[in-house]
């Protein structure tokens, strides 16, 4: 027994085949095996055995992967009245005609059928079920494998099978039903069987309990110690033998055996059809028990056995047509299918014009107008209100008459203040057409340095061409900030557009989030901001080419010791000049 157990454990797992047996009552002894017959319409590969008598409850059994190479047979010899699943088959029939010997088959053997008196034939199932004679109405249905088999069948069927003993290790299935023969060629042919089990005279059986476990002893203990408590031993009650109906479904390559086909219900009993779940070899026993208690299985729904095909098709079409189909967002086609579920509220399309090109239909729909100052206006215009009030600067009444012009007084005051300061540099004229940002490159104060970097990042993201003036690199820029801000304390960063102050880092961030900064700086957008200056590397300052940054003049007095050296007049106090390309 130990040798057989070790041989079975070395086998590869047998996946893809399991069998369902539905029996309302306990069956008695069944005859020796014969060649298999099946109909080509089954769908699931599981095996169920009904343990109790006079009950329609089925016991599910899921063959585990450790059951590879086991010899499967239903029933027992005529002497006993069991309904268990054994791994060996005793061919010693209790008949006075001819005594038979006990054999243990090393291949997978499935016997389904009623008891029919006949001779025992040792043969191999045919590779393709080509020829088969007409069988009786109660011809047995058997699945056998290559090797030595014991077939108890009609003489015509036994004569058609080839009597060879080669081990090809593949399952051959023959379909035979009342003289009509069908061949299942391609779907079921890949079950590998063991070939190293020797024949022994010792009778060893594995009794399968209702939880799906099999045990090498008669106590029905799977090793957990709970099988005897949860599952009592089955009652042995002999019943009349019925020839079951075997169905083979090619779609999922599974086998289903239905014994209720020939069962005749009594007039007092009403049949209650319960959908059966077909389990695979990897299902757990707990899952099988839970699914068997349910009144409806998933396989029956997916297979369409409960609903007509036309009704299922109408339901699927209705579900697809029920949801609205979103194909565009803001007039633009969706790049991905999931883009229809996102809603973006960022003002990304307000400035759709790309570097002066206004050919886009979306840009034309926005009705942007060029902010050109009116010819009747003389003086300085506030840069923060010029873009908003260029098209709607006039004040109109309800009847449409013009009652005035917006911000005319404000612009007049700005012009008056500029004319009253002749001694102060006119930065509006100096910085006309420019965006100037005063920053610092000194990183000692982290907060100030981070704010400067953030403002520069915002301007570069908007592709704005601006002039950066580093007050840490030049004393001249520090003096400009004091004059512009009219304060001795210098606070950076500060943004100026057309010579007018826009604000510090907080104001720039707020304008950027509201979208006003994009509209304000739209005339200064340039693709040249994506490129770095090759001369200065983006620093906008270069060492003086005259003194090479040493501040010593080339015109030195080498004859007297009164004047040691003259300072260079071409650069600033640190020996730097502005980049000519920037």
Swiss-Prot record:
CDD domains the UniProt entry points to: GRX_GRX_like
InterPro entries cross-referenced by the UniProt entry: Glutaredoxin, GRXCR1, Thioredoxin-like_sf
UniProt domain Glutaredoxin: residue ranges: 423-528
PANTHER family: GLUTAREDOXIN DOMAIN-CONTAINING CYSTEINE-RICH PROTEIN 1
Pfam families to which the protein is assigned, alphabetical: Glutaredoxin, GRXCR1-2_C
Biased composition (Low complexity): 291-300
One BP annotation, GO: sensory perception of sound
Biased composition (Polar residues): 217-227
Region annotated Disordered, chain positions: 217-244, 260-300
Designated name of the protein: Glutaredoxin domain-containing cysteine-rich protein CG12206
Family per similarity comment: Belongs to the GRXCR1 family.
């Amino acid at each position: 027994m130990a040798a057989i157990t070790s041989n079975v454990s070395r086998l590869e797992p047998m996946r893809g085949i399991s069998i369902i047996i539905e029996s309302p009552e306990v069956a008695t002894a069944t005859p020796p095996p014969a060649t298999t017959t099946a109909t080509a319409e089954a769908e699931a590969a599981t095996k169920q055995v009904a343990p109790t008598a006079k009950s329609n409850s089925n016991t599910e059994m899921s063959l585990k992967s450790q059951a590879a190479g086991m010899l499967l047979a239903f029933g027992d010899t005529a002497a006993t009245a069991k309904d268990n699943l054994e791994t060996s088959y005793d061919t010693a029939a209790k008949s006075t005609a001819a005594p038979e010997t006990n054999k243990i088959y090393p291949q997978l053997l499935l016997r389904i059928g009623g008891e029919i008196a006949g001779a025992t034939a040792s043969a191999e199932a045919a590779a393709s079920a080509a020829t088969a004679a007409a069988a009786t109405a109660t011809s047995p249905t058997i699945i056998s494998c290559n090797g030595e088999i014991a077939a108890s069948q009609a003489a015509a069927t036994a004569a058609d099978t080839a009597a060879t003993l080669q081990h090809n290790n593949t399952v051959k299935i023959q379909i035979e039903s009342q003289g009509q023969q069908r061949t299942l060629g391609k779907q079921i042919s890949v079950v590998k069987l063991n070939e190293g089990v020797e024949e022994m005279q010792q009778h060893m059986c594995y009794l399968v309990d209702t939880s799906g476990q099999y045990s090498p002893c008669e106590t029905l203990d799977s090793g957990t110690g709970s099988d005897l408590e949860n599952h009592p031993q089955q009652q042995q009650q002999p019943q009349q033998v019925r020839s079951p109906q075997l169905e083979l479904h090619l779609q999922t390559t599974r086998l289903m055996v239905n014994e209720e086909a020939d069962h005749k219900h009594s007039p007092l009993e009403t049949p209650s059809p319960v959908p059966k779940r077909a389990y695979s070899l990897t299902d757990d026993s707990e899952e099988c028990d839970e699914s068997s208690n349910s009144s409806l299985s998933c396989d029956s729904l997916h297979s369409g056995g409960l609903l007509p095909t036309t009704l299922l098709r109408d339901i699927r079409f209705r579900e697809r047509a029920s949801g609205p189909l979103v194909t565009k967002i803001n007039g633009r086609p969706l790049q991905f299918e999931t883009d229809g579920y996102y809603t973006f509220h960022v003002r990304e399309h307000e400035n759709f014009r790309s570097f002066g090109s206004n050919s886009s239909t979306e840009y034309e729909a926005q009705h942007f107008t060029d902010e050109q100052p009116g010819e009747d206006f003389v003086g300085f215009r506030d840069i923060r209100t010029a873009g908003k009030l260029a098209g709607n600067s006039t004040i109109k009444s309800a009847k449409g008459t013009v009652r005035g012009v917006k911000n005319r007084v404000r612009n007049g005051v700005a012009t008056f203040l500029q004319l009253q300061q002749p001694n102060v540099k006119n930065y509006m004229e100096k910085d006309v057409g420019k965006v100037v940002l005063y920053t610092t490159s000194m990183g000692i104060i982290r907060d100030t340095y981070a704010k400067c970097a953030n403002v520069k990042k915002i301007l570069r993201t908007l592709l704005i061409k601006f002039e950066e003036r580093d007050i840490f690199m030049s004393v001249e820029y520090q003096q400009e900030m004091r004059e512009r801000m009219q304060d001795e304390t210098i606070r950076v960063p500060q943004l100026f557009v057309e010579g007018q102050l826009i604000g510090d880092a907080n104001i720039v961030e707020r304008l950027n989030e509201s979208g006003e900064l994009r509209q304000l700086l739209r005339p200064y957008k340039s693709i040249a901001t994506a490129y770095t200056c090759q001369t200065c590397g983006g620093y906008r300052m270069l060492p003086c080419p005259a003194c090479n940054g040493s501040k010593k003049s080339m015109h030195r007095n080498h004859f007297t010791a009164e004047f040691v050296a003259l300072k260079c007049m071409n650069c600033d106090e640190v020996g730097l000049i502005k980049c000519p390309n920037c």
